[in-house]
């Protein structure tokens, strides 16, 4: 008789549940570990062509997986681009949600976005999408700027493009950005559960949005600006444009489950398919954000959920929208106070070359959630 059989039934059941949950918990904790390099300095990208020399690591680089470190070694100059793309993504996340209950809070250290990423909710979906998009965007732009040794502009578009224009110039290398982003960002995901599928899908949605928002730019050539012929190239969108699209997709995100209707014993092939929780809804497209868990209300502080609450947040007393005091303060009410502010005003440019301004003081009315 084995030791397991000697245990009381409630003990064996508890142990079994704990052991079953352990891989999922470990996978959740490993997701997004690479975000810890957000503030890394470009000077740490100490790379050489000699395979016998190792990448010099600072503590935050230890958060990268073996594959991620290998990709950094193989692409000199790319570490700064990845870190810069992540910083831009964080700023964009904060901008897009600045007037909502969840305002994309971040913290120093390896757990950049806090405990919310351990939940399969909409906010986690947006975080994964915007950070993936940020890396793809930054790497593609760095290629065309010549900052990465292993890539250049996208020169594949050459020759006539239309009756009065042709391809030329330096197109942003979105293909390299997407490929590197997929290899680097997705390799940080472990497991084969629904959370794993959700994160991979949202990572790809971020990259796809950068690609789909690219636009053609042209320059005219001809006598006296007659624009007889134009030279055109493909240009990346701003990350703000990408963030606007992803924010809209956050609002319309699809709640999903496994393609085999939620069984946690799906085959590998079945795991590659996500289906809407509501059978009446269309399956999520590659552009859509997906989630499987309801979001907290973010109204009050919760250490377990990692939510700060909205107490003390500034609100708009005249707005019926999400930034209004009624919604943002969760019905708790708000306080009003005045603040005297001194700002530069009536600035005048003097030739040459300085600007003179006056200091103007005015009273600002502030509304804060209770």
Swiss-Prot record:
Any phenotype upon disruption?
Answer: Important perinatal lethality, due to defects in brain development. After 14.5 dpc, embryos display dramatic malformations of the mesencephalon and metencephalon, and especially the cerebellum. They show mild midbrain hydrocephaly by 17.5 dpc. Only one out of ten live-born pups survives more than 30 days; these mice respond normally to light, sound, smell and touch, but display severe ataxia.
Q: InterPro entries this protein is in?
A: Wnt, Wnt1, Wnt_C, Wnt_CS
Renumbered to this chain, the positions carrying a covalent lipid of the kind O-palmitoleoyl serine are: 224
- Show the GO MF annotations: cytokine activity; protein domain specific binding; receptor ligand activity; signaling receptor binding
Q: Which GO terms describe its cellular component?
A: cell surface; endoplasmic reticulum lumen; extracellular region; Wnt signalosome
Glycosylated positions are: 29, 316, 346, 359
List the cysteine pairs that form cystine.
Answer: 93-104, 143-151, 153-170, 218-232, 220-227, 299-330, 315-325, 329-369, 345-360, 347-357, 352-353
Position of the signal peptide: 1-27
| The keyword DNA repair is assigned to this record | no
Keywords, in A-Z order? Developmental protein, Disulfide bond, Extracellular matrix, Glycoprotein, Lipoprotein, Proto-oncogene, Secreted, Signal, Wnt signaling pathway
What tissues contain this protein? Answer: Testis and mid-gestational embryos. In the testis, detected only in postmeiotic germ cells undergoing differentiation from round spermatids into mature spermatozoa. In the embryos, expression is restricted to the developing CNS in regions of the neural tube other than the telencephalon. Expressed in osteoblast; expression levels increase with advancing osteoblast differentiation. Expressed in the brain, femur, spleen, and hematopoietic bone marrow.
Tell me the Pfam families matching this sequence. Answer: wnt
CDD domains linked: Wnt_Wnt1
Source organism, top-level taxon: Eukaryota
> Where is it localised?
Secreted, Extracellular space, Extracellular matrix; Secreted
Report the PTM annotation.
Answer: Palmitoleoylation is required for efficient binding to frizzled receptors. Palmitoleoylation is necessary for proper trafficking to cell surface. Depalmitoleoylated by NOTUM, leading to inhibit Wnt signaling pathway.
Per the UniProt entry, what is one GO biological process?
midbrain-hindbrain boundary development
Q: Which PANTHER family match?
A: PROTO-ONCOGENE WNT-1, WNT RELATED
Q: What does this protein do?
A: Ligand for members of the frizzled family of seven transmembrane receptors. Acts in the canonical Wnt signaling pathway by promoting beta-catenin-dependent transcriptional activation. In some developmental processes, is also a ligand for the coreceptor RYK, thus triggering Wnt signaling. Plays an essential role in the development of the embryonic brain and central nervous system (CNS). Has a role in osteoblast function, bone development and bone homeostasis.
Q: Other remarks on record?
A: Many mouse mammary tumors induced by mouse mammary tumor virus (MMTV) contain a provirus integrated into a host cell region which has been named INT-1 (now Wnt1).
Per UniProt, subunit arrangement is: Forms a soluble 1:1 complex with AFM; this prevents oligomerization and is required for prolonged biological activity. The complex with AFM may represent the physiological form in body fluids. Interacts with PORCN. Interacts with RSPO1, RSPO2 and RSPO3. Interacts with WLS.
Provide the family line. Belongs to the Wnt family.
| Protein name in the entry | Proto-oncogene Wnt-1
């Amino acid at each position: 008789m084995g030791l397991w059989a000697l245990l009381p039934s409630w003990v064996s059941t508890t142990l079994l549940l704990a052991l079953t949950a352990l891989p999922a918990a470990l996978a959740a904790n490993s997701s997004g570990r690479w975000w810890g390099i957000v503030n890394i300095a470009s000077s740490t990208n100490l790379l050489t062509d000699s395979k016998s020399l190792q990448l010099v690591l600072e503590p935050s680089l230890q958060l990268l997986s073996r594959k991620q470190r290998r990709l950094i070694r193989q692409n000199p100059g790319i570490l700064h681009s990845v870190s810069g793309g992540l910083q831009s993504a964080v700023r964009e996340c904060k901008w897009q949600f600045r007037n909502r209950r969840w305002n994309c809070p971040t913290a120093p250290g390896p757990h950049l976005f806090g405990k919310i990423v351990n939940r399969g909710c909409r906010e986690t979906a947006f975080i994964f999408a915007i950070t993936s998009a940020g890396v793809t965007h930054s790497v593609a732009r760095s290629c065309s700027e010549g900052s990465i040794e292993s890539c250049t502009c996208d020169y594949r578009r050459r020759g006539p493009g239309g009756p009065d224009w042709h391809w030329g110039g330096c197109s942003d290398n979105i293909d390299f950005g997407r490929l590197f982003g997929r290899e680097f960002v997705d390799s940080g995901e472990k497991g084969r559960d629904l959370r794993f599928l959700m994160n991979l899908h949202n990572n790809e949605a971020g990259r796809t949005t950068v690609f789909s928002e690219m636009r053609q730019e042209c320059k005219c050539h001809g006598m006296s600006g007659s624009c007889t012929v134009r030279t055109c190239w493909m240009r990346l969108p701003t990350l703000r444009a990408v963030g606007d699209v992803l924010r809209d997709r956050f609002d319309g995100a699809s709640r999903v489950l496994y393609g085999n209707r939620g069984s946690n014993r799906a085959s590998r092939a079945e795991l590659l398919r996500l289906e809407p929780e509501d059978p009446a809804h269309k399956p999520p497209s590659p552009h859509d954000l997906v989630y499987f868990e309801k979001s907290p209300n973010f109204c009050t502080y919760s250490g377990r959920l990692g939510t700060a609450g909205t107490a003390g947040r500034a609100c708009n007393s005249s707005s019926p929208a999400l930034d209004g005091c009624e919604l943002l303060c969760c019905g708790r009410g708000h306080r009003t106070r005045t603040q005297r502010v001194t700002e530069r005003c009536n600035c005048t440019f003097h030739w040459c070359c300085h600007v003179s301004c006056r200091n103007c003081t005015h009273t600002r009315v502030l509304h804060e959630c209770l």
